[in-house]
């Protein structure tokens, strides 16, 4: 094993399991600041902000002779989505900068995580969210009197309202794009440890919006490319009703081949301009170096997955048997991004 791989493995804090907190397990495997003192300060703040940011890999099923494993990013997370990692990272970054009041826009997942993690440490939070997404939220996450929730009827105006709020109140914009990538580095570290220990991943499938997750993951994996010999092929999935990254990389004509409508398949991915974060070129690089691809799914594809027969069981039952908690509130699937990834696969 190479010296770089050994250095990574020796940096793992084995007092913390990955199922408990990938933030604390891998914090010393990553470098966040050029200054050693600033880097140590941030890592010490992670000890304060971390609650529960657990990941695990579970066998799901064999479909057409392909073994499908699920990266469970929900069951062991404080807020039931991978955005719990963003909560731990962004609130640590906010504390590092001395922020006491923060404002952010979100489809729900990131905003819930920032609210929960921020309120716990005394920050005043302002979440701007599309009003159609209110049913996805748990009111108990916003019980703190300093946790403010602002609903906007037209989802296309959410960013504008949040920007005006920050300007009027003198509030910082969080999370910054680099913080999102840092959060994804922890997912990459989890996958890297598994791969260095022998897990073979031929293809990594994820639902994407701005593609912060795959970019952060592949930044970590790329550093150990010589040890891994090859990177997993990346397959990015977008919902047909809102597919700006697909359009940016493949063109509007290609996107037009799929039937679209106004109803989003995953309402938390409401942003129609995620390419403005400047992530298109790095996503293109990942697709080129891994011989990957982007695909679209629509409501018909999604319905086929939900109604499909997998060895006599539905997909939600298969996931439950694997120990994966798909959060459902009042009969509605709250977290659909993982199911969209399965649909695209």
Predicted regions and their residues:
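PLP-dependent amino-acid enzyme catalytic core
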Residues: 1-345
């Amino acid at each position: 094993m190479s010296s770089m791989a050994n250095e990574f493995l020796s940096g793992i804090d084995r007092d913390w399991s990955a199922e408990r907190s990938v933030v604390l397990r891998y914090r010393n495997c990553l470098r966040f600041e050029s200054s050693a003192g600033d880097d140590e300060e941030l890592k010490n703040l992670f000890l304060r902000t971390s609650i529960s940011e657990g990941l695990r890999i579970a066998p799901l099923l064999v479909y057409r002779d392909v073994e499908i494993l699920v990266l469970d990013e929900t069951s062991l997370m404080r807020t039931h989505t991978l955005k719990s990692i963003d909560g731990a990272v962004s609130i640590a970054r906010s504390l590092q900068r001395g922020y006491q009041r923060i404002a952010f826009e979100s489809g729900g997942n990131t905003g819930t995580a920032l609210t929960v993690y921020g309120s716990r440490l005394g920050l005043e939070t302002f979440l701007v969210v599309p009003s159609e997404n209110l049913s996805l939220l748990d009111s108990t996450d916003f019980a703190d009197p300093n946790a403010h929730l602002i609903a906007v009827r037209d989802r296309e105006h959410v960013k504008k309202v949040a920007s005006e709020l920050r300007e009027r109140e003198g509030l910082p914009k969080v999370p910054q794009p680099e913080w999102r990538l840092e959060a994804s580095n922890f997912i990459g570290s989890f996958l890297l440890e598994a791969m260095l220990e022998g897990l073979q991943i031929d293809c990594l499938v994820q639902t994407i919006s701005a593609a912060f997750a795959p970019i952060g993951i592949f930044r970590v994996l790329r550093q150990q490319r010589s040890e891994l010999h090859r990177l997993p092929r990346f397959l990015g999935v977008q919902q047909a009703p809102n597919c700006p990254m697909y359009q940016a990389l493949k063109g509007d004509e290609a996107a037009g081949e799929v039937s679209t409508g106004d109803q989003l398949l995953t309402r938390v991915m409401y942003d129609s301009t995620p390419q403005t974060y400047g992530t298109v070129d790095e996503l293109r690089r990942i697709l080129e170096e891994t011989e990957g691809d982007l695909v679209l799914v629509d409501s018909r594809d999604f319905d086929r997955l939900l109604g499909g027969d997998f060895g006599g069981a539905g997909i939600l039952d298969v996931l439950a048997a694997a120990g994966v908690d798909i959060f459902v509130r009042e009969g509605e699937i709250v977290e659909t991004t993982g199911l969209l990834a399965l649909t695209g696969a």
